[in-house]
A protein has these predicted regions:
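Short alpha-helical patches at coil-to-helix transitions and adjacent helical residues
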Residues: 72, 76, 162-165, 192-196
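A generic structural motif
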Residues: 131, 144-146, 218-220
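A structural signal for short, well-ordered beta-strand segments and their strand-loop junctions
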Residues: 125, 152-156, 214-219
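Metal-dependent nuclease catalytic cores that hydrolyze phosphodiester bonds in DNA/RNA
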Residues: 1-138
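Conserved catalytic cores of phosphodiester-cleaving nucleases, focusing on short active-site segments
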Residues: 80, 139-165, 172-178, 199
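Short, solvent-exposed loop/turn segments at secondary-structure junctions
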Residues: 131, 159-161, 206, 222-223
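Metal-dependent nuclease catalytic regions and adjoining charged, substrate-binding loops involved
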Residues: 185-193, 197-277
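Short histidine-centered catalytic/ligand-binding loop motif
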Residues: 68, 177-189
Length: 277
């Protein structure tokens, strides 16, 4: 069995006729986050005299936010593609004292990516697609390493910042993810930790002889030429008109296996709710 990924609409589908209604890991994690009502927030900040958005039409504010989101996504896509290209140009690489092969993802056909075999041997797997048929979830890990009997996962993030705590109100109450994850702050570090932990869980399900290794976020920042009138960065470009990487900061991420198991149980009984949302 295998699945495909359509990069245009970010959808997953089965190659065969099993008709599984797939849910992406990012969609699954987002289900437990506090919803962000962009329209409502834009209307609120446009009326706040202390806000930089004061006096600006809410629709214009949302357009500015969307443009910034597109800018950040474009940078992220550039870095992902560059890393994949660099790694796939090599036959092997040294990791933890071992020389291991690099397995390129299957070639795209008409914009469609195909999942490779889920049973993994020692090596490096850029842009590795994972799926778990029993619960109908799938996703794509930026980098998976199988070395010395362990699974290492690395994910590239180009966000402005990685927040390890959520918003706390004047009473000292912080925003939490919804049950059964209400022990975790609703912040992007925990969102990513859950995402990568689910990838780890799926890989180990297909490869029970392997053990969990290290999980890292590589937080990427780029050289800035300037900032725009709203304070958003303008990337500095090299002679090839490409953004210049300033720094790559590795951030260790815990394997949240207990939380992942809770998600699997929840999904088994509530998949229709997750899809509906």
């Amino acid at each position: 069995m295998s699945i495909t990924f359509n990069a245009i609409d970010h959808s997953y589908d089965s190659i065969n006729t099993e008709g599984i209604d797939w849910i992406s890991v990012t969609t699954l994690v987002s289900y437990f986050k506090k919803p962000f009502d962009a329209k409502k927030v834009a209307e609120k900040v446009s009326k706040n005299k202390k806000s930089k958005w004061y006096g600006i039409l809410p629709d214009e504010i949302q357009n500015i936010w969307n443009a910034e989101s597109t800018r950040a996504t474009t940078l992220g896509t550039y870095y992902h593609n560059q890393r994949e290209s660099d790694l796939c140009a090599l036959a092997s690489i040294e990791r933890e004292g071992f020389t291991i092969p690099i397995f390129s993802p299957l070639p795209e056909k008409d914009g469609i990516k195909y999942a490779s075999i889920q049973k993994l041997e020692p090596g490096v797997y850029p842009e590795h697609m994972v799926y778990l048929k029993s619960v109908g979830i799938c996703g794509q890990s930026d980098l998976v390493e199988i070395v010395n009997g362990k699974v290492n996962i690395i994910d590239y993030k180009t966000n402005k910042e990685i927040k390890t705590e959520s918003y706390t109100d004047w009473e000292g109450k912080s925003d939490k993810l919804s049950p059964p994850l209400d022990n975790l702050d609703d912040c992007n570090f925990n969102h990513y930790a859950l995402q990568l932990s689910i990838y780890m869980y799926i890989i180990l399900k297909h490869n029970p002889k392997l053990k969990p290794g290290k999980i890292f976020i590589h937080h990427i920042s780029f050289e800035q030429e300037d900032v725009d009138k709203w304070g958003y960065p303008i990337a500095k470009l090299n002679y090839n008109n490409e953004p210049i990487v300033k720094e790559v900061i590795p951030i260790a991420v815990p394997y949240l296996v207990d939380e992942v198991i809770s998600i699997m149980h929840y999904l088994h009984d509530n998949k229709h709710k997750v899809k509906k949302k």
